Amino acid sequence: MQKLQIFVYIYLFVLIVAGPVDLNENSEQKEYVEKEGLCNACLWRQNNKSSRLEAIKIQILSKLRLETAPNISKDAIRQLLPKAPPLRELIDQYDVQRDDSSDGSLEDDDYHATTETVITMPTESDLLAEVEEKPKCCFFKFSSKIQYNKVVKAQLWIYLRPVKTPTTVFVQILRLIKPMKDGTRYTGIRSLKLDMNPGTGIWQSIDVKTVLQNWLKQPESNLGIEIKALDENGHNLAVTFPEPGEEGLNPFLEVKVTDTPKRSRRDFGLDCDEHSTESRCCRYPLTVDFEAFGWDWIIAPKRYKANYCSGECEFVFLQKYPHTHLVHQANPRGSAGPCCTPTKMSPINMLYFNGKEQIIYGKIPGMVVDRCGCS
């Protein structure tokens, strides 16, 4: 009994010397750990975001088959950018980004961009065709995007200078050919008559699909065209070689090629915001700003929602591949852990200058993360 009393006295002495026990110590440590964990998650997401931005730059150049970003200044763009209706409509009504992730489909697309519309500006011919000893507009070179795709539409756009009085204008599009025995150097493509009212000039489009298809089959026959738009006094109103103040009024070709859609399959995933405390694999918002990159050669969109994936992929979270969970349970050391990656990607439409100062309107696959999952 005396030994027990001594033990109790010693125990009480230790408590007094050690001081009172802080009952909140464990909760504070737990709170610190939780905050530290959240900070680590934020840092991990920031690293994923930075990596995604750098990957997007590389992907865009690669998918557009560009070794480097075209070096085109803003001043040059103002000079080269046509002021024509089809291009203005593309810019004004541009569908910057669809975020229809609710459809839950996984797109199987090709790696490289699928071109929908190519706007080609006139250039100088390697074999300069001349009529009456004067070079005539216009000669067009065609990229592989046009050469190796099915052309569904080809329009020649020309700008007619304004008139002071109501005038009837006779428009002729002539195709240059090799000299014939009788000296003929051209053959007609299309003729039309227009009634113009005084005031502003107008843009006129002309169907040249048949001619373009012939040029693609026989490239040596492409010697260029001559454009005439004569008023009643014989003055040519067509802008072929723009004068000062007529920048952006050059003739150009608008060519549309086919785009074959592909089938898709179903998939689902989590959506989060930057303030989310979700630890599982999730899709987070990310806006790409091309102006911040200094990429003035991209006409539209100037920015788009790309999104990125981040989060943990524990085996218990796996729903897409349940067999993976069973494999891990059978051999936990021999099976690699899953990663948080995109499971649904969608394309963006882009209007841009290529390395040859041609304006391209195309679809770039796999640029938007619509779903994230563990795989």
Curated annotation (Swiss-Prot):
Q: Which residues are glycosylated?
A: 48, 71
Which SUPFAM superfamilies does this one have? Answer: Cystine-knot cytokines (SSF57501)
**In the UniProt record, does the keyword Membrane occur?**
no
Question: Where found in the cell?
Answer: Secreted
Q: Name one GO molecular function term.
A: heparin binding
Q: Which Pfam families match?
A: TGF_beta (PF00019), TGFb_propeptide (PF00688)
Q: Which domain of life is it from?
A: Eukaryota
Biological process annotations from GO = myoblast migration involved in skeletal muscle regeneration; positive regulation of lamellipodium assembly; positive regulation of macrophage chemotaxis
SMART domains, alphabetized: TGFB
Return the Gene3D superfamilies for the record. Answer: 2.60.120.970, Cystine-knot cytokines
**Disulfide bond entries:** 272-282, 281-340, 309-372, 313-374
| Modifications after synthesis and translation | Synthesized as large precursor molecule that undergoes proteolytic cleavage to generate an N-terminal propeptide and a disulfide linked C-terminal dimer, which is the biologically active molecule. The circulating form consists of a latent complex of the C-terminal dimer and other proteins, including its propeptide, which maintain the C-terminal dimer in a latent, inactive state. Ligand activation requires additional cleavage of the prodomain by a tolloid-like metalloproteinase.
Q: Which InterPro entries match?
A: Cystine-knot_cytokine, TGF-b_C, TGF-b_propeptide, TGF-beta-rel, TGFb_CS
Range of residues in the leader sequence: 1-18
- Keyword line: Cleavage on pair of basic residues, Cytokine, Disulfide bond, Glycoprotein, Growth factor, Heparin-binding, Secreted, Signal
**Propeptide residue range(s):** 19-266
Q: Where is this site: Cleavage?
A: 98-99
**What is the role of the protein in this entry?**
Acts specifically as a negative regulator of skeletal muscle growth.
Q: What does the sequence similarity comment in the record state about its family?
A: Belongs to the TGF-beta family.
The identity of this protein, by name, is Growth/differentiation factor 8
